[in-house]
Structure formats: structure tokens, C-alpha cells
Amino acid sequence: MTGKECFLAAMNLLGEQEEGAAYYETFALGALRQLMNNCLREINALRQADGKEELKIAPQPGALEDALDADEAMVRECFPYGLAALLVCDEDHEKFNWLGSEFAARLDRHCPAAQFLVKELY
């Protein structure tokens, strides 16, 4: 999924028409970068489950046309809700709360638990 596709899905959740979404588009790339940063733990949990090496920093899209470099299913299921929430956080608190809750719930259901060793202290 590209950043633009995610943005259009977020606009659909907000009930915005593409031509009326120009205002939000100015903030979309920064918000997507923030989502990638916020989801690094989940990105790494999915990478670990696939046998891939963990990332130290989240991948950052350079433009909205770039593909979002994370698990495709997670991005498609979760990111439109998170992006929509970030885009309306200052203007519609009710939508922000619903979208943020939906984003968090979908992320929790989608991502595996991170596995790690427990250090014996005694």
C-alpha cells in the first residue's frame, strides 16, 4: 500500500471527497511517518515472526507515492484509522477518539505478541 492509498482510505473513513481533502494532504506525509515511528514495536514483532532481523528505526516514506515499508496486511487494516485520527486530532475530538481506539484495537488484534527471554534474578 502506498502512502497515497492509505491517505485516500483515511479520507473515506472521514467522509471526505478527494477534491476536498487537499487541506489534509498537506499533513499526511508527516502523519504517516509518525505512524511508522509509533508502530516500530509492532513492525518488529511481525518481522521477528517472519524470521527477519529487527529494525532499529522505522522505515520512513519519502513521499506519499512511496510504498509503506511494513507488513502489508497491518498497513491496510490499521494505518488508515491511525492516519485519519492524526489528521483530525485538533478539530474533531469525538472522531479522533473513535478512530484512535479503532486503530489501537486493530493493531492489537493483528500483531503477534513479542517474545523475549525472561532473565532469572534469583
State each model region's role.
Residues 24-25, 68-78:
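Structural motif
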Residues 77-90:
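Short, hydrophobic/amphipathic alpha-helical patches that form generic packing surfaces
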